């Protein structure tokens, strides 16, 4: 699943995920309020010619107002492919796996 699919899945079923990490995806159709309780870490590349970074930046700003835990990493010069293949670093994966889904 790509980054846009992660945004859609996380917003449709926020109660299923302890945290999400959409990479090089477009959240344009997502309501930020649906992710208010879901930690989000997203990665975008400035050289990505498929996904525009501006909507992601704007969405993450809205989400940060609702959610205390949001991270946007912008990788300088990374293409769409490089963003999709290089984003899964130990640091980022540890961030994901250190979250525990609430039973609430």
Regions of interest found by a model, annotated:
Residues 1-37:
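Primarily recognizes the serine-hydrolase "nucleophile elbow" in alpha/beta-hydrolase
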Residues 39-43, 49, 53-104:
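C-terminal catalytic histidine-bearing segment of alpha/beta-hydrolase fold enzymes
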